[in-house]
Curated annotation (Swiss-Prot):
Keywords: Ribonucleoprotein, Ribosomal protein. It comes from Syntrophomonas wolfei subsp. wolfei (strain DSM 2245B / Goettingen). The lineage of its organism: Bacteria, Bacillati, Bacillota, Clostridia, Eubacteriales. Belongs to the bacterial ribosomal protein bL36 family. SUPFAM superfamilies: Ribosomal protein L36. InterPro entries: Ribosomal_bL36 (IPR000473), Ribosomal_bL36_sp (IPR035977). This is Large ribosomal subunit protein bL36. GO terms for cellular component: cytoplasm; ribonucleoprotein complex; ribosome. One of its GO terms (biological process) is translation.
Length: 37
């Protein structure tokens, strides 16, 4: 899980979602997981 000021999808399987007011990227590849904060 990477914490970044701006989250961007890395590959075509990355999905941007909102959870508890936080913007997150979830993906099949665990290295692509990101959270804004």
């Amino acid at each position: 899980m990477k914490v970044k000021p701006s989250v961007k999808p890395i590959c075509e399987k990355c999905k941007i979602i909102k959870r508890k007011g936080k913007v997150m990227v979830i993906c099949e590849n665990p290295k692509h997981k990101q959270v804004q904060g």
